[in-house]
Amino acid sequence: MKIAVLLSGGVDSSVALYRIINKGYSNIKCYYLKIWVEDELSYIGNCPWQEDLNYVEAICNKFNVPYEIINFQKEYYNKVVSYTIEELKNGNTPSPDIFCNQRIKFGAFFEKINSQYDLVVTGHYAKIQIKESKFLLKQAKDKIKDQSYFLSHLSQKQMSKLYFPLGTLLKSEVRQIAKNINLPNKDRKDSQGICFLGKIKYNEFIKYHLGEKKGNIIEKETGKIIGIHNGYWFFTVGQRRGIKLSNGPWFVIEKDLEKNIIYISHNENYLKQAKRKFLVHEIHWINDTPTNFENFKIKIRHGEKKYSCKLKLITNNLMEISLNKKDQGISPGQFAIFYKNTECLGGAKIFKIIE
């Protein structure tokens, strides 16, 4: 069996490589995917991918496995970065990591290697199971690290070639394995933030592409101007950090795109803005469309929290979702991801808040 391993230089993908080798497989090649943004914004700091590459080389040398660097800068820009920029311009809250997995790691990469490999291994925290000739996406053992939210737009064809060795492990167990076998990156911190940015700060990325435009920050209840911001695209509904005003905490509760105004409110008033009903479109099911939606739960952001909900299919590409509890941070552009027990069934894009 020929196996390709996506190696990032981090602990997770390195332990995934070790576990597949430990199963007795030897016909293995590792790939490091080099992406667009890191070079384009390298003026901000040190070359962010060089450190990754140093670890990739050290890991492959340790296990005597060949590796190759594949340049996907153009594909990243066209399929992920441009989407993110457009969503920000439209005042939405994008979820680029979902498309990073669907369109690049398991899209462009699969197209590149074509049928050369029988299996592609990554360090994602999730599980794939087969039931009645269908591939099911299941949550990982570690519910905190679980990445099924970001994998929710995979296809059956993509899942048929994927294996996630870390799906049955806790993060603490992965760290312990790395120490036990003395991996060169055993003490390396986990990467944070959006997949394509590397060490680049998100606001630097936004500033580079959309610039800055001064606008008013207005207290919703009083209509008073209490501050100035550098552009609505730097803010998302529900945001608390980064407002940098006294007498807080403050929360972003509304954005006026035409006038470039950010409306904020104190905590007690912010909680009153919570919503529970919204519309989604661009619906993707990992398997066939369910015949009923009983006992479904959804996530509206990455993390452990799921909501019980009622789903009403209006058309094949339009659905109304009613949560059992209100949420303060529902925002157009986010994705609602569907679950039944531990199975991730797919997801859809939020485009209108109702109540």
Swiss-Prot record:
GO terms for cellular component: cytoplasm. The active site is at residues 100, 195. The keyword Cytoplasm applies. GO terms for molecular function: ATP binding; tRNA binding; tRNA-uridine 2-sulfurtransferase activity. ATP binds at residues 6-13, 33, 123. Its EC number is 2.8.1.13. Signal peptide: none annotated. It catalyses: S-sulfanyl-L-cysteinyl-[protein] + uridine(34) in tRNA + AH2 + ATP = 2-thiouridine(34) in tRNA + L-cysteinyl-[protein] + A + AMP + diphosphate + H(+). Disulfide bonds join 100-195. It is found in: Cytoplasm. The keyword Nucleotide-binding applies. It is an enzyme of class 2 (transferase). Residues 145-147 are annotated as: Interaction with tRNA. The record marks 124, 334 as: Interaction with tRNA. InterPro entries: MnmA-like, MnmA-like_C, MnmA-like_central, MnmA-like_central_sf, Rossmann-like_a/b/a_fold, tRNA_2-thiouridylase_MnmA. Keywords: ATP-binding, Cytoplasm, Disulfide bond, Nucleotide-binding, RNA-binding, Transferase, tRNA processing, tRNA-binding. GO terms for biological process: tRNA modification. Catalyzes the 2-thiolation of uridine at the wobble position (U34) of tRNA, leading to the formation of s(2)U34. Belongs to the MnmA/TRMU family. This is tRNA-specific 2-thiouridylase MnmA. The lineage of its organism: Bacteria, Pseudomonadati, Spirochaetota, Spirochaetia, Spirochaetales.
